[in-house]
């Protein structure tokens, strides 16, 4: 683990990291999040019967769009030419609820962790928004980086 925060200057001021001299490499990040809900809410979403429409399809697109706008949402994030973004949403009947997995990929000079995390977060928020009329007690949890590959800092995988 790195001991220094890369976005802070000598006086503690926030700065955008200069990545100009870094090598371009293929970088991938996978993030996940969960939306817990009542079993009946999950059943309604999976059946495609939510009043607002296709919850899963809309959340998937929202996550993809959010990843592309990460640099506009998070200060000091570099704009990236993303080569792939995918958002997968699967039922988890044990929660009960939905598991969101977002993958972001780029060939560039900086990582895509924030893009994957933003995609997962916004997909979860969209699920909540589209189903809140029937279940305001839904819980968004477990947003985290699961895996990253590429770049100077090396690879990372949860539990490894």
UniProtKB/Swiss-Prot annotation:
The keyword rRNA-binding does not apply. InterPro entries: MoaC (IPR023045), MoaC_bact/euk (IPR047594), MoaC_sf (IPR036522), MoCo_biosynth_MoaA/MoaC (IPR050105), Mopterin_CF_biosynth-C_dom (IPR002820). Pfam families: MoaC (PF01967). Substrate binds at residues 76-78, 114-115. Gene3D superfamilies: Molybdopterin cofactor biosynthesis C (MoaC) domain. SUPFAM superfamilies: Molybdenum cofactor biosynthesis protein C, MoaC. The active site is at 129. GO terms for molecular function: cyclic pyranopterin monophosphate synthase activity. Pathway: Cofactor biosynthesis; molybdopterin biosynthesis. GO terms for biological process: Mo-molybdopterin cofactor biosynthetic process. Catalyzes the conversion of (8S)-3',8-cyclo-7,8-dihydroguanosine 5'-triphosphate to cyclic pyranopterin monophosphate (cPMP). This is Cyclic pyranopterin monophosphate synthase. It comes from Mesorhizobium japonicum (strain LMG 29417 / CECT 9101 / MAFF 303099).
